[in-house]
Amino acid sequence: WVRLKNMVTRQRFDWLSMDESRPLPVSIPSMPLSLKIILVGERESLADFQEMEPELAAQAIYSEYEDTLQFADADTLKAWCQWVWQNAQQLELPGPAADAWPLLIDEGTRYTGDQETLPLSPLWITRQLREAAAFCEGEEITGEAMQTMLARRVWREGYLAERMQDEILQEQILIETEGECVGQINALSVIEFPGHPRAFGEPSRISCVVHIGDGEFIDVERKAELGGNIHAKGMMIMQAFLMSELELEQQLPFTASLTFEQSYSEVDGDSASMAELCALISALANVPINQSIAITGSVDQFGRVQPVGGLNEKIEGFFTICQQRGLTGKQGVIIPAANVRHLSLSHELRQAVADNQFAIWAIDDITEALPMLTQLMWDGEGQTLRQTIQERIAQATQQETRHRFPWPLRWLGGTSSN
C-alpha cells in the first residue's frame, strides 16, 4: 500500500526489487505514470480510509451512486424499464411482459417505501427476475408468473409473522378489535428479527390508568429500563402538549401510568407517541376508545402529527388480525397524512378498502384522531374532551382541599376571611 500510495501521489513508477535484501543489478530510472485509483465502498469504509490517510483523502474526488430513482413523468419511468431490460439481457433472463410491469413497479415502490421512487440496485432487480423466471414458460415473464413468485415469497418468509398472529388469535396476547375501553388503544409496531429477510407488523396494546396524585407521568417502560431514549423523548413531548393545552394554573392533581402491555423487550422510537397521547387523554377524561381502530404516528409539542416508518407492515399486520376475526366494516387505522405517499399495500387489503370493509384515515393533527376514537371533539362547542378533563381536575382539586382541611377549620377559615 505504501508503494501504491507513492505512485499515486508522485505519478511515477519506481523499479524496485521484490526482495529488499537483493537490490537490482542495475539502476533503472523511474518512469512517468498516469494512475488513478477508484475506491468503492459504503460511507463507514470511506470514513475509515479518510481517518487513516487524510492527505490522500483530501485529494480525492468524491461522488455517490444513487440506489433509487424518483420518477415524476413517463420518460423517467420508461428509462427505469429500460434499465430492468438491460439487466435481464446481461443475465440472459426473460424480461417482464406488459402485464407484469405493474406488479414489478408495485414491488419496487414497496421496497423503497415511496410511491414515487424505484430501486436501481442490480442485485434487487436480479433477484426479482431470477425468482420470477422459475415460473415462466415463455420468453417473457408474465403477470401470472410474477404474481405467483411474489405469493410464494410471502409464504416462504411468513412463518414468524403467522406464529405471532396465532398468539393474538389464540388470545395469548390480548388485542381487542371490537368494543370500547377507557385508557386502552391499539398502537402499531414493526418487528424485525436478525437473519430474517422480512419485517412484519403487529398491533401493540397500550394502556393508561390515572389516579389522584401529584401530577407525575409514569413511563413504565422507562422505569423498567425497557424504554429507549427516543421513546422517552416522545413521552416528554406528549406531556408538554397536554399540559400546554389544559392551561393549568397549578399542578395536575392526577398521576398517570402508561405502558405497552405484554411487552418484554426493549421499546424505542416515537412512532407510538400519538397512540400514547390518545390513551392518556381517554384515561384523564374517563371516555372510552374504539378498539376497532389502530393508530400510528408521532406528535410534536403543538399536536401536529409526524410521519413514521414501516407503515405498510404496520397496516397489514392489524388488517390480518381483523380479517382472521372477521371484517365488520368499522375497523381501520389512523396514519399521518405525510405517510400517504409511502403506502404500497397488498392487493387483498386494497380490495377490502375499496369494498368499505376496512378503512385508512390520514390526519394532520391529533385533534382529528380523537373524535374518531372517542366520539368527542378535543375542543369546541358542547361537551368536549378538554372540558371533561378540566371538570375532573376541578373535582379532584376540591376533594383534595376537603381532605386536607377538616370542616371546622374550613368554617373558621371562612369566618376569619370575612
Where are these regions (language model features)?
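Conserved C-terminal "switch" segment of AAA+ ATPases
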Residues: 50-51, 57-58, 62-123, 138-140, ...
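Conserved P-loop NTPase nucleotide-binding/switch module
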Residues: 1-12
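Ordered, soluble secondary-structure elements with a strong preference for glycine-centered loop motifs
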Residues: 40-43, 50, 70-78, 94-98, ...
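Peripheral, non-AAA+ core regions of ATP-driven protein-machinery
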Residues: 2-4, 20-24, 141-143, 211-224, ...
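Canonical AAA+ ATPase core
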Residues: 10-75, 90-91, 324, 339-342
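C-terminal helical "lid" subdomain and adjoining coupling/linker elements of P-loop NTPases
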Residues: 92-96, 109-177, 380-381, 400-403
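Phosphate-handling catalytic cores of nucleic-acid transaction enzymes
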Residues: 2, 24, 32, 45-48, ...
